[in-house]
Amino acid sequence: MEKSPDTFALYRIVGNDLYPRHKKGQTCENLKFILEHEPELENCEKKWIVNRIIDKEEELAIITQLHHHEQPFIHIPFHEEAYKVIEWDMNCLPDPGYLVSKEFENLDSEVRIRFIAAMYQLKNNYVMNTNGARNKALRDGRSRVKWILPWDGNCFVTRAAWKQIHIDVTASPHLKYFTVPMTRVVNNKQLLADEFTPRPVEEPQLIFRDDSIEEFYEKFCYGRRSKVELFWRLAIPGEWDCWKDDPWDQPRRPKSSEAGQFGAAGWTARLFSGMKKLEQDNKASFKQRGLARLEGIISTLRHVDVMIAGKSADSNTLSMYREDVLKGEERNYRSGKHLPHIDQLIADAKEAITRAPYSVTDKKSLPPSDNIHDYWHPAPYWWPNPNTKDGLPYIRRDGKRVPGTHIYEKKSDKYDRSRLQRVFDDSIILAMAWKFTGDKTYAKHGARILERFFIHPDSRMSPHLIYAQVRMGRNRNEGSGTGIIEMKDLYYYLDAIRLLKSAGVIKEDSFTKFKDWLSTYLTWLVQSPQGKKERMAVNNHGTYYDLQVASIADFLDNHPLLFETFIRAQSRIALQFAVDGSQPEELKRATSAHYCCFNFQGWVNMAEIASKWGIQLWSYRAPNGASLIKGAKWLLSYAGKEWPHKQIEEFDVERFLPIWFAVPQHLIKLPKSAKFPKSKYTVKPRFFPHDGVRPYWNLGLSRRDYH
C-alpha cells in the first residue's frame, strides 16, 4: 500500500444555506469562487456532492455552474415524500413529561436551543445529510484513488496549501488518516494574494487512505459534532476532548482499532460565510457560530415543514372545518337537498341575530382589579372556607360548582364566562349560516360581535385572563393558570373570523386590530405566570393550552411557535395516556367520564390543526407505546356499556360519537358494544359547551360516514 501511487480525490459537499449562520445564496457564491479561482491540484481529481438542496432554484443554479465548468458530481436529491414521514425524535426526552416540566422551563436559552435541535435530529439527518454525504464520497473514492478527501463545500485549496498537503501525506504513507486544519477568511479574495498567510487553527478536515476502515457515524447530525465524533474514535486530540455531553446527546462510540494512526497535513481555507461577526478567531465568536448554526438548522427544518404543508395550508385556511366538504354541503343545500342540521343552523343563526353584540363591560360585578375591561370569573370549584371568619382562603370542592360559574345559568351574568361562550358560538354559527345561504345579514352581525368584544376601545376585552378562575384569598386574588381553559374554544372562533373575512364584512383596519389583540394575548399566554403554569399541566388543561397556542400561532403565521407547540403536544401523548389507552389523570376526577371525553375531544381538535400542517398525530406512537389510537379504542370500548369509574353527575353518552367520527376510519374498528349511527349527519350537531365539542362539528367534517 505504501508503494502504490499517491492519487487523490477531493470531494466537496455542497449543501443548504442556513440562515442566520450563512448569508442566503452564500453556497452559490462560494462555489462560483472555487470554480473560477482554485488551481488544478497535482495528482488530484475533483468531484462534488450536491447534497439534498431544498430550494429547487438554488439546486439548479449549483448544477448549472458545475456543468458549465465541466465538473463531475454526485447528486443526492431532496424528496418531499421521504421527509414527510420523518418524525421528531421523542427518544431524546429524558422522560415523557420533560417538555412540560419545571426543569425544561428553567433551561437557559443556549441549552434550550441545543435541546430543540436534538428533537429535530432525525429530520436534520435527512435534510443536511452531512455524514451521509461524506460517506458517499468515501465509498465512491475508495474504489478509484489512494487518498480520499470528503470535505465541506466551502473548503478552498490554494496552490501553496496543496503543495504542503501533498508533501506531508506522501512523507508518511504508512498512516491511514490525516487531519488538515482550517483557516478562516472574511474576504475570499484574500486567498488570491501570493502573500496570504494562513492561521490554520480551526476544526480540521480529514483525509482517508483507501484501506482505512472507519467512516463517519451517520447518527451524529450536523451541528452536533458530526465530524468530531470520528475524531474521538480515532483519538485525534483537540479542544473537543473537553466538551461535555447533554443528557439527550447520542452516546459516544468506543475507540477505533485504528485509533492513533493519523498525522497532520498542510492546511486548507474555509471560505466566507457571509456573516463577518461570526468569523472571528476567538472563543466568543466560536460560541456564537455554534448557536447560529443550531438556530439555522432549526429555522431551515421549520421552513421545510411549512414549505411542504404550505402547498395545501396557510393562515387563511380553515383549521377545523374542511373547506372542500363545506363546499359540497353548500352545493347540496343550495340545490334543495336540505340537511336537517343546516336548517337547524339557520334557525340558530336567526336567534343569534336577536342577541346584541357582547362585551366584558356588560358584567354585573367587577374583577379584583376594578377594571371592567378585564375578563372576570371565579374558580368554579372553590368555595369560602368554613373554618375562617372571612372565608379566606377559599377551599376546593371537586365536582361542586359555585353559583354563576355554570354557563348560561342564573347569576352567570355577574361574570364573563357565559358571555365569552356566546361570542364563540354565535360567531361560528353566523359565519356558517352565511356560508350556506350567502346572506350577509348573518355575517354582518358576526362582524359586529368582533367589533364590540375585541376592537372598540369602550367595550373591548383586555388581552389577558389574569382574573379567570380567581381563588379568593390566594395568589393576590389573581386567577390561576387553570383559568386559561375558559378561552379553550378560541380555535373555532378563529375559523369564524376566517369565514367572516372571506364574506367581506370585516374592515381591514379591524382585522389588523384583532390580530394585534391576538398577538398581545399570545405573548401573555406564553410568558405570564398563569401561562407557564398551564403549559406545565399534565392533564386536560395542558391539552387545551396547546390547542389555544397552536390555533393562534396558525392564525398569525407564527410558524416557529406553531411547530414548537406541535412538538410539545406530541410529547404529551406519552404523559397523558397509559399503554392501554386509559387517561390516568382524568380518571382521578369525580366526573371521570366527562373529563376523559373532554380531554380526548381536545386531542381531536389538536390533531385536526396539526394535520393541516402535515403533522399526523393520529399515527404517532410514543416510545412507551402510548398513542391517540389506543386512547380512542380504550375510550370507545365503553360505548354501550356502563362507565366503571367515578362519575357523580349524569353523563351524555352521545359524546362518544364526535370522537368516533373524528378518528381516521382506517385506524380503528367499531366496538361490538357500540350501536353507533352510520352517518354523522344523524347525530345531534350541538353539545353543551363544557363538553368541548365545537358547534355543528358534523358539518365540514372530513371523515366519511361509516359503512
Q: Language-model features: where?
A:
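Short, acidic, metal-binding catalytic loop of nucleotide-sugar glycosyltransferases
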Residues: 26-44, 65-69
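Long, repeat-rich segments with strong aromatic
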Residues: 544-646
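N-proximal low-complexity "stem/linker" segments adjacent to membrane-targeting elements
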Residues: 1-36
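Active-site-adjacent structural elements in folded domains
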Residues: 120-121, 413-414, 476, 480, ...
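Extracellular glycan-targeting catalytic surfaces
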Residues: 313-531, 543, 567, 611-612, ...
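Active-site-proximal specificity loops/subdomain of glycosyltransferases
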Residues: 57-145
